[in-house]
């Protein structure tokens, strides 16, 4: 069953443009290369960055992403600009 994860980040004040550039150049293509469906991003009030990812085996694919040498080699790593993370697992019914 395809599962979705909603991710909401609070980005450091003044860093949204840098975060978006780095995320688009590195995180999104890496996720997509590992079979993730990526929707978004959306930017909201209070420096909020919102996106959705989906995969048929979300937990295993997420573990592969974080263990990948490509993820470890991200430079600059956009995660340094994230101040708060909220994640929600979703299933379509």
Question: Model features per residue range: what roles?
Answer:
Residues 16:
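Active-site rim elements
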Residues 45-47:
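Short strand-connecting beta-turns/loops that link adjacent beta-strands
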Residues 3-8, 19, 30-31, 49-53:
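Short, structured motif recognition centered on aromatic/hydrophobic residues
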Residues 22-41, 54-90:
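An amphipathic, aromatic/His-enriched active-site/gating alpha helix that lines ligand/cofactor pockets
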């Amino acid at each position: 069953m395809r599962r979705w994860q909603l991710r909401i980040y609070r980005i450091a004040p003044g860093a949204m443009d840098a975060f978006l550039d780095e995320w688009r150049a590195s995180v999104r293509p890496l996720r997509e290369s590992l079979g993730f469906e990526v929707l978004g991003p959306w930017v909201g009030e209070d420096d909020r960055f919102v996106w959705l990812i989906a995969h048929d085996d979300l937990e295993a694919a997420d573990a592969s992403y974080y263990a990948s040498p490509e993820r470890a080699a991200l430079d600059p790593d956009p995660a340094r600009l994230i101040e708060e993370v909220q994640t929600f697992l979703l299933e379509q019914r």
